[in-house]
Amino acid sequence: MIASLDELYHSELFFLPVMDENARLVGLEIIATFAAEDGAVRMPTELVAPRLSVEEQYCLFVEKLALLETCQHFFIQHKLIAWLNLPPAISDLLLLDSELFSRAARFPFLELAINENYPGLNQGKNNETLANLAMHFPLMLANFGAGEASTKAIFDGLFKRVMLDKNFIQQRAEMISFEPFMHAIVAQISSSCESLMIAGIDTEAMFARAAPLGFSAFQGGLWPPVPVSQLIKLVQR
């Protein structure tokens, strides 16, 4: 996809691994970076996304679905989950556009990731769009703890999985209360979702601290993103 910012950028897609407590692959999040045409500048999606038009967000979402289609047998064979971030601007389109809906719904292993800044998230199941999405697709709250939402949508059972925000984790990790605080979150949230995951695991030391705390999966710089050509290496370790 080509994005028109201060100059032209093209999207490049990668797979960000999610591991279990034994460092075995359980799923992959499809993420995008944006590179300038000359390749000199690269930017992550979170910096570019606020500047993308609805049409560009739609194209990026479709591009991710197309990539997923090319490697769906890999996900099925290895019983892996795929996560795609769903921008708020695409939520209604996904429910209203039958072709787009069918393209997403055809993957039984696909789950949609929602961020805390999703409009009306604090309404929980009273948010009609969010409730309808949860009826048709497994949802993951991708950055719980970012400080932009309450726990209502979680306790309303809208999310199959909850991922703790990487910045929240890295800030808390510096405190001596990290372990008991994480135990408290696990105790509070676990009964409201199928899986509680943690991001921000950038080192072996951090993985060793987080692994015994009751989380089902882990994501971070310890397992960097890979292009589609290197997917098979993730299951050969």
Curated annotation (Swiss-Prot):
Keywords: Repressor, Transcription, Transcription regulation, Virulence. GO terms for biological process: regulation of single-species biofilm formation. GO terms for cellular component: plasma membrane. Changing E29A: No effect on motility. Pfam families: EAL. Disruption phenotype: Decreased bacterial resistance to hydrogen peroxide and accelerated bacterial killing of macrophages. increased levels of c-di-GMP. Down-regulation of rdar morphology, 50% reduction in CsgD expression, cellulose and curli fimbriae, increased swimming and swarming. Decrease in c-di-GMP levels. Derepresses transcription of flagellar class II operons in nutrient-poor medium. GO terms for molecular function: cyclic-guanylate-specific phosphodiesterase activity. Transmembrane segments: none annotated. Belongs to the YdiV family. This is Anti-FlhC(2)FlhD(4) factor YdiV. The lineage of its organism: Bacteria, Pseudomonadati, Pseudomonadota, Gammaproteobacteria, Enterobacterales.
